[in-house]
């Protein structure tokens, strides 16, 4: 029943974006969601993280996925806990649709920071920074791209080709807006394009 209600709600909300081509998704979301900030940068800062057991997770290895990246530094407490709870709600909306196979949520935390939110591990990765870096340092590297204050935790949305698409600040944003933004990215013009075969001129110039 809950699954059906979420799907119905998303279908009702979707027309708000239906008349907007993919290249306008940032403009539309800026109008609808005060917590949203456009990034539109070709790449993200470096991030070296390990999964439980010591396996290295590379964001580049998820190039075919939309990534929702968040940070839970030590002593972040309530602000981060609230954001994690909202993000699990977004995951729930995503996972009742085919988007589940196209979206990965990544939470970076310090080893002694607790994550109380109930995530679906099917498309959620919990990681810690590599090389003795702190989560706060990694979060600051990402937040440096923002033109807003850094008091609130940020959820970074990374497009399938590694483009740093946008940031959702804090925990007061609409879960449905983030879900619709993810859906828009899945369908928009920023998706990776298949390689094209070289023509004779490209083949000739390639010799030099």
Label the predicted regions.
Residues 58-87:
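Short active-site neighborhood of thiol/selenol oxidoreductases, capturing the structured segment around
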Residues 22-63, 85-86:
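N-terminal "domain-start" segment that seeds a small globular fold
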Residues 9-18:
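Hydrophobic h-region of N-terminal signal peptides that target proteins for export
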Residues 122-125, 136, 140-156:
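Structural micro-motif
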Residues 149-208:
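Thiol-/selenol-based redox modules, centered on thioredoxin-like
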Residues 2-8:
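Sec-dependent signal peptide recognition
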Residues 82-138:
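Structural microenvironment flanking redox-active thiols in thiol-disulfide oxidoreductases
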Residues 44-45, 67, 152-154:
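Short loop/turn microsegments at loop-to-beta-strand junctions
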């Amino acid at each position: 029943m809950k699954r059906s209600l979420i799907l119905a709600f998303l279908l009702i909300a979707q027309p708000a974006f239906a008349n907007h081509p993919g290249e306008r998704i940032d403009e539309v979301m800026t109008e609808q969601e005060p917590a949203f900030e456009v990034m539109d940068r070709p790449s993200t800062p470096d991030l070296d993280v390990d999964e439980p057991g010591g396996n290295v997770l590379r964001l580049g290895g998820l190039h075919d996925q939309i990534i929702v990246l968040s940070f839970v530094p030590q002593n972040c407490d309530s602000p981060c806990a609230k954001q994690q709870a909202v993000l699990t709600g977004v995951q729930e909306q995503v996972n009742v649709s085919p988007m589940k196979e196209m979206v990965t949520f990544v939470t970076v935390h310090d080893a002694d920071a607790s994550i109380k939110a109930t995530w679906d591990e099917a498309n959620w990765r919990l990681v810690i920074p590599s090389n003795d870096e702190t989560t706060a340092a990694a979060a600051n590297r990402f937040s440096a791209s923002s033109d807003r204050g850094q008091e609130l935790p940020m959820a970074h949305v990374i497009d399938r080709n590694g483009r740093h698409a946008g940031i959702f600040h804090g925990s007061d944003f609409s879960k449905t807006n983030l879900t619709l933004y993810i859906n828009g990215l899945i369908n928009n013009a920023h998706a990776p394009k298949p390689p094209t075969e070289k023509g004779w001129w490209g083949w000739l110039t390639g010799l030099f």
